[in-house]
Amino acid sequence: MASRPAASSPVEARAPVGGQEAGGPSAATQGEAAGAPLAHGHHVYCQRVNGVMVLSDKTPGSASYRISDNNFVQCGSNCTMIIDGDVVRGRPQDPGAAASPAPFVAVTNIGAGSDGGTAVVAFGGTPRRSAGTSTGTQTADVPTEALGGPPPPPRFTLGGGCCSCRDTRRRSAVFGGEGDPVGPAEFVSDDRSSDSDSDDSEDTDSETLSHASSDVSGGATYDDALDSDSSSDDSLQIDGPVCRPWSNDTAPLDVCPGTPGPGADAGGPSAVDPHAPTPEAGAGLAADPAVARDDAEGLSDPRPRLGTGTAYPVPLELTPENAEAVARFLGDAVNREPALMLEYFCRCAREETKRVPPRTFGSPPRLTEDDFGLLNYALVEMQRLCLDVPPVPPNAYMPYYLREYVTRLVNGFKPLVSRSARLYRILGVLVHLRIRTREASFEEWLRSKEVALDFGLTERLREHEAQLVILAQALDHYDCLIHSTPHTLVERGLQSALKYEEFYLKRFGGHYMESVFQMYTRIAGFLACRATRGMRHIALGREGSWWEMFKFFFHRLYDHQIVPSTPAMLNLGTRNYYTSSCYLVNPQATTNKATLRAITSNVSAILARNGGIGLCVQAFNDSGPGTASVMPALKVLDSLVAAHNKESARPTGACVYLEPWHTDVRAVLRMKGVLAGEEAQRCDNIFSALWMPDLFFKRLIRHLDGEKNVTWTLFDRDTSMSLADFHGEEFEKLYQHLEVMGFGEQIPIQELAYGIVRSAATTGSPFVMFKDAVNRHYIYDTQGAAIAGSNLCTEIVHPASKRSSGVCNLGSVNLARCVSRQTFDFGRLRDAVQACVLMVNIMIDSTLQPTPQCTRGNDNLRSMGIGMQGLHTACLKLGLDLESAEFQDLNKHIAEVMLLSAMKTSNALCVRGARPFNHFKRSMYRAGRFHWERFPDARPRYEGEWEMLRQSMMKHGLRNSQFVALMPTAASAQISDVSEGFAPLFTNLFSKVTRDGETLRPNTLLLKELERTFSGKRLLEVMDSLDAKQWSVAQALPCLEPTHPLRRFKTAFDYDQKLLIDLCADRAPYVDHSQSMTLYVTEKADGTLPASTLVRLLVHAYKRGLKTGMYYCKVRKATNSGVFGGDDNIVCMSCAL
């Protein structure tokens, strides 16, 4: 992918000019030799230099050049023309450099031919005066004769712009009409350099963040308000502002919608191309390219062109009367240019900014020039995609009507995002704009009873009002300048924006909504309030201030480098201090009455706080003739979960754990869905999990190897004695002794195995965990009091008893943000893990617990779960496949760095004076042993660091007992717009149907790769084929070469599941909790799924030593009717983050 020229070599990417290298003699010299005099020396080059040649027209008196390109179809209207002259070089000039008028460029003609196309590029200082153009924008004419006579009109236009693509395919009716000759520019362009969220450049966001707003009112900059902490080697080197600000004498909409601006990319994300450097504020403004095109073509357009100097018939004051008058003044022009009203809105907003007092917490929110500019950007981009955009209504300057207009746009165009990554981003921008229309003032937010901010946090925020106001202004401006950085928060995508709007942002005051800035201020501010002195030293290298710690957390949260769990996102900073995600309850109840008491008290209290629960019911084992079964108690639990979720905006759930020798195991396997025999036994709102001893799989393997009459024995409470309390060899000796004594009911082992896989394939559960592996690798010996269960999502390993419940607080790091220029940045990963460990320790210290048992579990072990999200996204950004040797090595490397960084940070807290967790002295850490040392195949690459940590750990201790837990990140991965957890993408086009309609979430990286590979009719055919094959590239394009880039875009169903199990096993030495590993299987062509498929996968997971053998089982139907993964009415939002 071509990138913007490096600051140190601005001519590096130029194509030859006039037969010379761009770094050679000036274009002025070449132009004179060709008889084409220029007022200034200008080099011209294309950002994508693949075969592009800029040639002198060699016409006496001409001020034009021709582009010769053998791959002009790929370049097309998105060819980023960059001028290297006195003002605009390969990068912005130093602020003190002398200014001169910037040239403009307009592509005026395209020639088609098998040997390449040509385009006339007209140069000028400022255009000649046209109707409606102010006297300040006059220029000398470009002689039509110099261009060899009037050229034919452009092949097609996009919203007033012109396109240079030769493609002659018919456009899909959904994008603009049956008779249009070509499709949307998105399908023609090469997104690699023009799209602001290109996969290779978005990793510069965190570096660009600190430079993004150098011209906020009052001289405030983002650097002043929030220093960037990134020190990556790939930081952009820029000498001036990233984007030219809209100064008081500069119209924000100089370029008509759909028309390329100076040096702009007609398919790019803004009127000013993000990759093309732009002149400093105050420099001569580039002319309207549409006027230049008229000059070059000799056309006479009677339509008035509205510029900075347009004289409106009413004052620059937004009132209903003035807005209606301007609408009448513009007349039919607003139908041709839907965003035309926005120029008036922008100029009025600019005038209002001059009148209003400086911003404070009490300042009422208002729509600013930046907000209208954001809307203009979105409308221009949609026009470039050939969408029929409705005009901006005259009353859209009012928040309510702007919200209605945005909703109309989003609902109307969201079905089309499956074909356009850019549209997916643009609709996300619009949703963020809709969120802004519901903002309240900071003062109203601080006082809100519904938000209920922590009192200490409120005081701190008031103490730092001036800094926070500057930061808010800087970020507002920064997010509106989305074309100044590859991938800002507002441009993460439609699903990300909707997730904020619908779930994470708090409602208050009837119709107000917490802003994204306020949400992250609440979280980061609270973390800064509760950070200890030791934490400040670790984070900042010195004690530091509250404001410095606030910046430390805010930057990493706002940039999605670290992501708190869902309870933390919703509750941190409020007086509702419940931030724990996972609870493990083992009431050890042996009777129906005791089990019901545990459910209605202990479990109900946790559900009331929206916690996800793993409940061990192994001890209640009285099923038999004339005795009670556990099923009536589970029916009560099922109803309790359903009742809690009915009124909850954040549904949760419970999972019951029992071992496979429990007499009720067969009933539990039949309690969900179509397998439930009678209604009294149906429990559709809870999950089940089997706590499998090694002995079961040893016998199952014997059966699979051909041994006959292999049996398994079920025991009740009276005969099972203490089987649940032992593991490993002790369990096997006791179990076999009971069999010899003749106790229990013997069944063929294949009968139970078949029941397990039948239930899993039909309902998605039971989940499967390996009891011996969990206990074998725990931090202390559990023989005689074996760990008996896990949490709702099977990734937490924690002891629980009648007196103490297991509790875990979660956070995750976004691995996709660690990819920098197709390189994985382990320094950034270490920084993110460190910040996440500090955040979770503050959560452990601050959180309330719903029961005394939970309080004991939280305080004694201080267990944390640091997870990951975006592993597959990072893999794709790096250009790798999960099957490649490079990725498999990276997979182990990432896991090791995460555990090492987490343990080093936890140890550093103890070095700084914090107490080790209460059970440290009985743990293996006291003896200097690590989790990975129990895995014979583990080969750590940081042996020196591990040895230093060992010595420090034995001397000072660890603040936490456990560290890494790889949970599903279903919710938070949506706001980050990355793949969930460590799993491959479930599908390349995710569809979610709600009462508001269907929302699609495409794999934008795949869409961009498709646009690089195909064009025209072939691209549309490929997308149709993907639709028919559930967006599986392997099925839709089976003829691709094995090394083709598109081969990387496999879904979870396309991968060999044994490979995914092996990847989990490779990470296992460095995952001291466990991993929520889902299995993805596909039916055979006849619609059947052999039981042996799942059985052999479970056996493989057992042999590889995993703790979790199967979280969900998801089955892809052979009939193209979708994917079944159990009951979709229950969604775990606790440890699913």
UniProtKB/Swiss-Prot annotation:
SUPFAM superfamilies noted in UniProt: PFL-like glycyl radical enzymes (SSF51998)
The residue ranges flagged as biased composition, category Polar residues, are 131-141
What are the site positions for Important for hydrogen atom transfer? C582, C808
- UniProt feature, compositional bias: Acidic residues: 196-206
Iron among keywords: no
Which domain of life does the protein's organism represent?
Answer: Viruses
Site (Important for electron transfer) at Y1111, Y1112
The active-site annotation reads N791 (proton acceptor), C793 (cysteine radical intermediate), E795 (proton acceptor)
Question: Which chemical reaction does it catalyze?
Answer: a 2'-deoxyribonucleoside 5'-diphosphate + [thioredoxin]-disulfide + H2O = a ribonucleoside 5'-diphosphate + [thioredoxin]-dithiol
Molecular-function GO terms, alphabetical = ATP binding; ribonucleoside-diphosphate reductase activity, thioredoxin disulfide as acceptor
What keywords are assigned to this protein? ATP-binding, Disulfide bond, DNA replication, Early protein, Host-virus interaction, Inhibition of host caspases by virus, Modulation of host cell apoptosis by virus, Nucleotide-binding, Oxidoreductase, Viral latency, Viral reactivation from latency
Question: Residue numbers for the site described as Interacts with thioredoxin/glutaredoxin?
Answer: C1132, C1135
Q: Where does substrate bind?
A: T566, S581, C582, G612, N791, L792, C793, T794, E795, P968, T969, A970, A971, S972
Q: Which GO terms describe its biological process?
A: deoxyribonucleotide biosynthetic process; DNA replication; release from viral latency; symbiont-mediated suppression of host apoptosis
Q: What class of enzyme is it?
A: oxidoreductase
Q: Where is this region: Disordered?
A: 1-32, 124-159, 173-315
Recorded hits in HAMAP family, A to Z, give:
HSV_RIR1
Comment on protein domains = The RIP homotypic interaction motif/RHIM drives self-assembly into homomeric amyloid structures and mediates interaction with the RHIM motif of host proteins RIPK3 and ZBP1 to form heteromeric amyloid structures.
User: How would you summarize the oligomeric state and partners of this protein?
Assistant: Heterotetramer composed of a homodimer of the large subunit (R1) and a homodimer of the small subunit (R2). Larger multisubunit protein complex are also active, composed of (R1)n(R2)n. Self-assembles (via RIP homotypic interaction motif/RHIM) into homomeric fibrillar amyloid structures. Interacts (via RHIM) with human RIPK1 (via RHIM). Interacts (via RHIM) with human RIPK3 (via RHIM); the interaction leads to heteromeric amyloid assemblies. Interacts (via RHIM) with human ZBP1 (via RHIM); the interaction leads to heteromeric amyloid assemblies. Interacts (via C-terminus) with host CASP8.
Could you say which protein family the record assigns here? Belongs to the ribonucleoside diphosphate reductase large chain family.
Function field: Ribonucleoside-diphosphate reductase holoenzyme that provides the precursors necessary for viral DNA synthesis. Allows virus growth in non-dividing cells, as well as reactivation from latency in infected hosts. Catalyzes the biosynthesis of deoxyribonucleotides from the corresponding ribonucleotides. Prevents host necroptosis by targeting host RIPK1 and RIPK3, thereby hampering the formation of necroptotic RIPK1-RIPK3 complexes. Forms hetero-amyloid structures with host proteins RIPK3 or ZBP1 which may prevent RIPK3- and ZBP1-mediated necroptosis.
Q: Name the chain's protein.
A: Ribonucleoside-diphosphate reductase large subunit
Q: Which organism is it from?
A: Human herpesvirus 1 (strain 17)
